[in-house]
């Protein structure tokens, strides 16, 4: 009977599949990991921009401890106004990299493109350039007595590999559970991190990729960018 019904609906243009109870397959990355993080996870939002991730995380994890990093003077002023008084949101007007220091930062006319790198093609112009302070994830955790990171999100417009290298100690000690990282396939920035570099680095540090989210394509139809979710293999059940 089930087979007959399935074939009938298929001829009508409908396809029936079993409900997949694996939360990791949820189209929303934050809902995908919700059941594995508990009610008050520690989240690192690296490359906060205008606070988009703060809003998403606090909606799903209202009791989370969220450490947000944004080097842009303009963007940081905005997120301070919007989220400066939100409980357990810690705002840092710094960039994150593989070690402490400072580096020249490019502010674009569209803030989502702000980066240490110059664009490979011009759809937005640089309106300001200045040096910003950089801290590593490992140093920040050490200085602020942060025992672990449930979710490390990095969206830094090509600087992702540098961010991840700065979390090497935390990763090696299995103190990072999930990594949510922006990936470029097409050259968007000169000198950007490649997909293979990021994938290989995380694999070498014991992370398995779960899936991609929000694929974008070039005008020619080639893969341009996406976001990828990785899980530390020590947390796979």
Q: Predicted segments — roles?
A:
Residues 1-237:
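Phosphate/nucleotide-binding beta-alpha loop and adjacent structural elements of enzyme active sites
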């Amino acid at each position: 009977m089930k087979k007959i019904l399935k074939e009938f609906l298929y001829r009508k243009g409908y396809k029936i599949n079993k409900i997949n109870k694996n939360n990791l397959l949820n189209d929303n990355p934050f809902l995908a990991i919700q059941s594995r993080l508990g009610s008050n996870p520690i989240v690192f939002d690296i490359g906060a921009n205008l606070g988009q991730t703060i809003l998403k995380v606090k909606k799903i994890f209202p009791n989370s401890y969220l450490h947000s990093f944004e080097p842009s003077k303009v963007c940081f002023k905005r997120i301070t106004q919007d989220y400066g008084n939100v409980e357990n949101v810690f705002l840092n007007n710094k960039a994150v990299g593989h070690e402490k220091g400072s580096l020249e930062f490019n502010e674009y006319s569209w803030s989502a493109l702000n980066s240490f790198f110059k664009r490979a093609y011009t759809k937005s112009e640089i309106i300001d350039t200045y040096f910003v302070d950089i801290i590593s994830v490992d140093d920040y955790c050490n200085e602020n007595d942060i025992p672990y990171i449930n979710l490390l999100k990095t969206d830094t417009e090509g600087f992702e590999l540098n961010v991840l290298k700065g979390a090497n100690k935390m990763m090696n000690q299995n103190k990072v559970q999930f990594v949510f990282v922006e990936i470029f396939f097409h050259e968007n920035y000169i000198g950007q991190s490649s997909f293979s570099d990021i994938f290989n680095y995380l694999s070498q540090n014991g992370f398995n990729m779960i899936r991609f989210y929000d694929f974008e394509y070039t005008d020619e139809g080639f893969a341009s960018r996406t976001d990828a979710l990785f899980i530390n293999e020590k947390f796979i059940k």
